Amino acid sequence: LGDVYKRQGTEFRGVNLWVLICATMVASLGLNVNSAAVIIGAMCISPIMGPIMGIGFSLGINDFDLLKKSVRNFVLMFVVAISTSTLYFFISPLGNASSELLARTTPTTYDVLIAFFGGMAGIVAQSRQDRNSTVIPGVAIATALMPPLCTAGFGLATGQYRFFFGAFYLFFINTVFIALSTYIFTRFLKLSLIHISEPTRLQLI
């Protein structure tokens, strides 16, 4: 399980970078033309779930190095996705907000529950020896990370900041509760903790 999250948390270059850019473009196009099917496809191929679950996992086992790499790559993915979607919507001739865009601007309590239990499903699936390859795409669809990011890009590109803040808040909620559920279940599994000799570093974790 540790090796899985080390790969997910540390690898953001080459293929993953281009996959993220393509996923962002697909999601932006789907939001622009109001196509739920296209948006779902973008959520399935986006690699942004890896660093988020890597953050929760690294906190659960006190792996400070993995935490730093996961946070760094999460921030990089966030910046790349926001920049790509903002650029797309800036040059897109379709400037009207579709119902799919509007749906990502008003987070509810249900979004919190979906993110929490979606993240829980992800860590449970990864902890199995026969890791079910259908679970992680399902989690990505349920928790919907890419659409809020692209909606935030739409808000920036069009100067409609209520779209940006509403969508960013939804993305933030999803991120926090996916990481939280991963952390809780990692602790529940009682995986081996990384020994930390420096008290200050332990406090940071």
PLM region spans:
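Hydrophobic alpha-helical segments
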Residues: 98-186
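Short, proline-centered helix/strand-breaking motifs
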Residues: 43-51, 143-149, 199
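A cytosolic-side transmembrane-helix exit/cap motif
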Residues: 56-69, 154-162, 184-193
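Juxtamembrane and boundary regions of transmembrane helices in multi-pass small-molecule transporters
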Residues: 81, 86-95, 167-193, 197
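Short, small-residue-biased leader/transition segments that mark boundaries at the very start
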Residues: 1-5, 198-202
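Alpha-helical transmembrane segments and their membrane-interface boundaries
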Residues: 3-115, 128, 132
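Generic secondary-structure signature for well-ordered alpha-helical cores
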Residues: 7, 11, 31, 126, ...
